[in-house]
Structures are given as structure tokens and as C-alpha cells.
Amino acid sequence: MCSMPHRFRRLPLAAAIALTLPLPALADTPKPTELDRVQVKVSTATRSERLLSDVPIRTEVLRKEDIALRAATDFSRAAELINGLRVESNCQNCNTSEVQLLGLPGAYNQLLFDGIPLLSTLGSVYGLEQIPAGFVDRIEVVKGGGSALYGPGAVAGVINLIPPLPARSGGHVQAGMDVLKGTPQKNADVRLDLVAKDADAGLSVIAQRNWNSGIDYNGDGYTEITRKNLKVGGLQAWYAPTPGTRLRLDLQMTDETRRGGNRLDQPEYLANIAESLDTKYRRGSVSWDQEITADVDFRLAYAFADIDRDSFYGGLGDVVTDPSAPGYDPLQLDPDVAGSAASRSWRQYGRTHNPLHYIDSQLNWRRGAHALAFGVQYKHEALRDDNRTGDGQRLAVLEDATFHNLGAFIQDEWSLRDNVDLVLGARVDKSSELDNAVFSPRIALAWQANPNLKWRAGIATGFRAPEIFVEDVHVDTLGGEQVRVRNTDGLKEERALTTLFGFDWRSDPANPVWSWDATASYARIRDTFALGEIQRGDDGQLSQLRYNASGSNVMGAETNLGWQPSPQWRLTAGASWYRSRFREPQRIFDDTGDGGDTVIESRDYLKTPRWTGLAQLSWMPAEPWETFVALRHTGPMSVLNNRLGELHRTRSFLVTDLGARWHRHLGAQAQQEVSVAAGVKNVFDQRQKDLEVGALRDSDYVYGPRFARSWYVNLRYAF
């Protein structure tokens, strides 16, 4: 494998910049203290709105100003702006992705919308790209499982998408384009907010569309970026009949088609490789927040998600499809000819239905130095996955499962002193997949050592039950053949213990020119779920077996540095280091059963770099302008190529983005705004160079930056 140029290898990661601090707002020229992240109000850590500097459990924030400056159109692109939070692509054909947190894969964190779980099992496959930025006011990230308020599997933390709550009627219209390899990726969205005069009720209507043609990076005729057409519509409504009551309704409907591979103008079964998805996703929630007295309040919420998906994973494989090419055989393209390639691919269609229901309740009682929280949560999910023919006939039921989890929690936020907060909590969860309930204690401590320095520590336990996972409903392909995942008999639950210790420092609480924080973490996972090598079964199908490994350990550290000498300049820097390893080597490749002689074992988590970092310098030369230069570093990682039977250590990547934003206020009260954002993403085109090619490619062999160099422009009118 090639390596990063010498000058980049020596670049100190401590100089990489993380966007965990908010950027300057363009509407005004505020004082630096107004921009410091400790002044931001958050609600995720304790489910009560507090200043970020006061919460006892470490929380990081990405505000809408940050998202707008970088022209991020969906959550997957916005998430990459947070230090220690990494989006990894997992398929060259369909571009499914996951969010890694604390050095752990996406299955170990929980994605929330206004505090309520957002994605079902099937929704997690492509859901990161199906959440428009227009639905989000800010993103709050709680790393580690220090709060008992969230589910048992959130051992790496929670990512909470907070929706806007407009104070006046208005809205925006926005359109943009990224030009990548000469192909435009287009997006447009509109938002309309209607707010009552006394602001006790409101309605927001949102719509967004993203669409692009398939993009081929290496000219082999097979896409690296899927052809996609995403349409999203939704509404958010709220009503506060009394000062202590708030009712909220959120609805979202998503219609997405995506297809990757080759021969995109032909039916899927006539492509050498095709991964094609047609997804209908309906999601909603209703919540009731009620203040009973000054010391007692409660919240009740119900959420649902319902997904229907028609899919195709597979293809003809290495079959000649050009009539003028040597070896062309038209019978191979006829599904009615027994034994032909088309007769096999005709049977690779599928249909999946995945409903999810979630009920959440919480009672808060403040008494003296204690803030007690009690709650019950219930999740019910079903998944049916059928294998079908090209004309819709059912061949087999691949999955037909229903599972649920009933959890109860108690948490005491105890102010031991004016400068010491202790959070004691515990959960009891009964999963339908386990015989016994699981007790998960959690504790967090915060100590304000002086006005400039705050220390935090936390210990949490959690588990993951052996349910249906993302890998079961996303099907990898190897040479046009499906690779299915199944659980071994007697698969046990994972048990996890995570610990965190860190500090936050500010140079001057009243005028913070400098800020610095650092956190060390350690996670011990028992009976870790692991995927074995790809094998061909007695039925001739390729599959991977999920089993319990002996366990794994993940240790790491993150640090962020911020400097703002004036409202015009801001520099933020951060780096993360994580070592994610199994306790014993795991066999990840073995072709001896097919007559080969290659066996590969590894202790490392695959596609998990040890070093990552982010960087941004922003400058406001004049009130209408803001410019930035940003860096994103991804260190080497271990990646398996199943086609070659090789474990590769990748190169490092240093992605550079440049951009600017101009705006002008209009109207008598300057409530209207016109803005233009433009720039270049991935200026030096840092990305994977050894992409798999042709019909026999291993779709899972993809790593590093997801997008090649692109030019972008975004136009926005707010009113």
C-alpha cells in the first residue's frame, strides 16, 4: 500500500482541528464570550435544559451555524464535523455508512431525535443520509454511557438531533450543488414556520430533495457513488396551552431510490453487479411535557418508524454483456434458461418490512440538593425480509422476527457541594431475546476545581442482545454473489463496561480567548459479537457467521483546543487516538475449505483508525463575509480484501476544505437574509486509490474519505 508523503506524516495531530466549538454567527458581530461553547444550552445529558458548562456529563455541540457554513445537506455530512465522531462507508456499491464513536462501531451508539430513538434496524442501513439538515437546529453528542436515561446498548454514547423551535413566523428556501468528477449532486430544501403571536403554538413544514447520477471514480464502468433520488417531507407542530405545558408533534416521510453497480439503464438482474433499493420510510413522534409544580414535571412520548423496502443485491457476475465482445452468450442473459446467470440473478430481489414502536416516560422531582428522574421505556420492533423474483413472487422468508425491550431507570443528580455534582443511576432492561433482566448501573462525577477548570469522570455498563442487526439487512456482494449474515446457535448478549475521565479548561470565564479539554476512555466488552470468514455453504450460498468472540478492549483519548482572539478570528483544533482490539486473534479469512491455503487472523477492529483529527480556521474579514479552511485527518487502518484474501494496512489521509459565505440582511427589521456559500471540498483529492474494479469486486473493500474532490455552491433566502 502507498503511504502519505513524508511531510504529511510528520504533521502533528495536535494541530488538527475539531468543530466541537461553535463558529461565529453571521447576523451580528458578538463578543467572544457569546461564542464560547460553554454558553450554549443543551438538554441531552440530563434531559433538562442547562448551560453546557454546567452539565455534569460531558456533552459536545454542533450548531446550525456550523452546518450552514460547511453546506452540509444531511446528517452524515454534518457528523463529520465533530472530533472523535467518524462516518465510515461500508459498501462500494450502495454507500451504506455508519457513525463510529469512542473507537466503537455504529451499533454501540444511539441516534436520537429530540431525545427519542430515531432509527430502526433497517433504518440504520441508509438512515444517516436520509436526515435532512433542515430538520436539525443543533447536534448534541454525549460520549460514553454515563447517563441512565438512554438505552442499554448506548455504551459509546448518544447523538441527539435537536429540532428547531422558531420564535417567529418565517422560513427559508435553499438550493445547492456539489460537482464531483464532473457530475452534479443537487439539493434543494424549503422550510415554512408559522408561529402564533404570543408564541404559544407553531407549525413548521419542511421539504428537501437530493438527487444525482451514479459516479464512477476509476472509469471501470461501475459506480462508487450511487445514483440517488431522495425526497423528504415533514412537519413539526407544537402547542403550549399553559406556561408549564408543551405538546409536540413530528412527522417525516422519506422516499428514496438508489442504485449502484453497472448497466444502470438495464433492469437489475441484467447488470453484472447491482445494489438497488427503493425505500419508503415513515417516522413520527408525539410528546407531552408537563410541569406539575416548581419541583415536579414529567414527559410522555410515543414514536414510530415504519419502513418498506424493495431491494436487489447481486447480479450476473463475470458474464459478458456486450454483444460485440468475445465470449458473449445471449442465453446467459435469459432468466428462463435453466442454469444461466440471469436465472440466478432473477431470484436475488427482496422485500423488507420493518415497523418500530417506542414509548418513553420520565418523571423529574427536585428536592433540595437532589434532582431525581424515574422512567419507563418500551421498544417493540418487527422485521420481515423476503427473497423474491424479479416479478415479485416470494421464494423464501429470510427473516421473520419480533423483539422488544422493556426498561426502567432511576437517576439522582446530587449536588454534593456548590462545585461538585454526582450522578447516580441504574437501568433494568428485559429483552425478549434474553431469559433474565439485565441490571446496568451508571455513575458520573463533575468537580468545578476553580472558575477555569472542571473535571469529569464516569463509569457505565450496558449490553447488546442478539437481535437482528444492520449487517443482516444490508447484503454485501462478492463477484455478484450475495453474502448473507446469520447468527450462530446459542449467541449470547454482549456486556460492556465503559469509563471516562477528563477536564475542561477556559482561560477566562468572562472572556474566554482560550479553551482546552481532554478525555481518556476505556471500554471492556465481554462476548463481543464478531463476524467470521466468508464461507460457501452446502447450498452453494456465501455467508458469514456471527459469533461471540472472547471479548475486546477499546482505549483512547481525545483533546480539543480553541483560540479566539477576536470575533473575527477563530481557530479550533482536536485529535483522537483509539486502539480497538479483540483479546484474542479472530479468524477473518480462510479459503482452505475451497482448496486454498490462506488463513488470516487479526486482533484489530477492521476499518477503525487509531488516529483521527479535525481542523478549522475561520475568518470574518467584514460583517457580510466569513471564510474558512479546514482539515480532516484519518490515520491508517486494517481493511480486509476478501477477493484477494489479503489484510491491508491503509495509508493516511488529510482532507482539506476551503470555503466562504456571504450574506446580506434585507427588510425594515433585517429579518430577511440572502446568503451564498461556495468552496472546494477535498482540495487535494485524498481518497482510496486501490478501489476494486469490475464484476468480481469485493464491495466491502472500501475505506477512508467517502467523496472525491468537489466544487460546491449553495444559495439561501431566509425570511
Label each residue range with its predicted role.
Residues S415-N419, S515, S521-R524, L545-N641, ...:
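Gram-negative outer-membrane beta-barrel transporters
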Residues T183-W211, D220-R258, S276-D297, R366-F374, ...:
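Transmembrane beta-barrel wall of Gram-negative outer-membrane proteins
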Residues L51, S76, E80-P117, D137:
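Extracytoplasmic beta-strand/coil segments of soluble accessory domains associated
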Residues E98, I116-K143:
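Short acidic/polar hinge/loop motifs at secondary-structure boundaries
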Residues R191-L192, D297-Y313, Q448, R456, ...:
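Membrane-embedded beta-barrel scaffold of Gram-negative outer-membrane proteins
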Residues C2, R9, A16, V40, ...:
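Conserved C-terminal beta-signal and adjacent last beta-strands/turns
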Residues S120-L122, G134-D137, A148-G219, T226-G233, ...:
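Outer-membrane beta-barrel translocator/receptor signature
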Residues N212-I215, D220, E224-L230, G244-E291, ...:
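Flexible loop and strand-edge segments within Gram-negative outer membrane beta-barrel domains
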